[in-house]
Regions:
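Short beta-strand segments
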Residues: 115-118, 241, 280-284
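Thiol-/selenol-based redox modules, centered on thioredoxin-like
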Residues: 27-39, 43-44, 162-213, 323, ...
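Conserved redox-active cysteine motifs that mediate thiol-disulfide chemistry
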Residues: 86-103, 242-267
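A short beta-strand-turn-helix
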Residues: 61-82, 217-239, 267
């Protein structure tokens, strides 16, 4: 919880960082430099939960690159070490670390498989492609379908996963620097398991489509109590609002257009929720957010709709929400009508359509 609180404070401070792409250093250069100070904009405190992945069989997963290639990780285990870096386009520590990722790829891209995996939280393929171009990323760039993020238990980006030739996790953490560099070298020196490679099978991700009944999904209230997303038949249709407590403030420093959309979405929902014809509920992303941060947000913004924290990311994954802000429209039978995401200008029309369908 201290880690999340620390990261939340860092995010809300909106520290601007000039993260323009730099030329790739020579392979013999130091990989990712010294460990950062907690006062550095690129610093993120380590999550002890990630360390529990060390020694576990890596996930059997096929990733699809932004240029259409499929990468089956299971085909690599036992043959090559694998380094997966999870990141987001707007994340300041992710941007700070990108030169280090380029160095690692320049040094060891011919000896291990290195993949930049976008976490698909507040991003889409257009933003990811532009970021890869701006930051001169030449390794495969993919977008997670939600299963890798779920398996990792990710609550903040970036996340580094270093996997040895035996298919087991050597390192899982947020920071680059000496510890990551040592893990990369350990992976390169690793040997395949003599009796084959064990993997972790991930459950298929089921995303709701129009007409599907909304399942009960556990959330957290701002006081840390367990609550359930409204579901089942009701006399009124429902609208579920998806956003993040930090998207207006934090993204203002890296993606001001996206921050403006978050603000517009919040203001639209505030107005639309004033009527009594639709039941509203808000779901806030768990990324970089603890219940205390949600409580602070509620105190500051005084939202007219009740809010819940998507503490495991299950609600965002179940509804397939990738962009902020978003609204899911639900009929009186508790079935999904449609999802509108990333474009708050369409919210009012969507709500009018839902009201007319009663």
């Amino acid at each position: 919880m201290r880690r999340l609180a620390h990261v939340s404070l860092l995010l809300m401070s909106c520290c601007a960082y000039g993260a323009s792409p730099q030329a790739t250093p020579a392979p013999e250069a130091k990989l990712t430099g010294a460990a950062l100070s907690p006062k550095d904009p690129g610093y993120i405190e380590e999550d002890p939960v990630l360390a529990k992945l060390v020694g576990k069989p890596a996930p059997a997963l096929t990733l699809k690159s932004i240029d259409g290639r499929s990468i089956d990780l299971s085909d690599l285990y036992g043959k090559r070490p694998v380094y997966l870096k999870l990141w987001a386009t707007y994340c300041i520590p992710c941007r700070v670390q990108m030169p280090g990722l380029r160095k690692i790829f320049a040094s060891y891209g011919d000896q291990m498989t290195i993949i930049a995996v976008n976490a698909a939280v507040g991003d889409d393929i257009g933003k990811v492609k532009q970021f890869a171009q701006d930051f001169d990323l030449h390794m495969p760039v993919t977008i997670d379908d939600g299963r890798l993020v779920e398996w990792v238990g990710m609550k903040a980006t970036p996340v580094h996963l270093v996997i040895g030739r035996d298919g087991r996790v050597i390192f899982a953490g947020h920071q680059d620097g000496p510890t990551l560099d040592a893990a990369i070298k350990q992976a390169l020196a690793s040997k395949a398991a003599p009796a084959g490679v064990a993997t972790t099978t991930l459950a298929e991700l089921v995303t709701l489509k129009a007409g599907d009944v909304i399942p009960p999904i556990e959330l957290q209230s701002s006081d840390g109590k367990s609550i359930t997303l409204p579901h089942g038949p009701d006399s009124r249709p429902r609208a579920i609002y998806f956003s993040a407590t930090w998207c207006e403030s934090y993204m203002k420093s890296t993606q001001p257009d996206e921050a403006a959309k978050c603000k517009e979405g919040r203001e639209q929902v505030d107005k639309l929720a004033a009527g009594q014809t639709i039941e509203w509920f808000g779901v806030m992303s768990h990324m970089w957010t603890a219940p205390k941060a949600l409580a602070n947000y509620e105190s500051k913004m005084k939202p007219p709709v009740p809010l819940g924290l998507d503490s495991t990311g299950a609600a965002f994954r179940t509804f397939g929400v990738k962009r902020f802000p978003a609204i899911a429209l639900i009929d009186t039978q508790g079935r999904l009508v449609k999802l509108v995401e990333g474009d708050p200008a369409k919210f009012a029309t969507a709500i009018s359509s839902l009201q007319a369908s009663k």
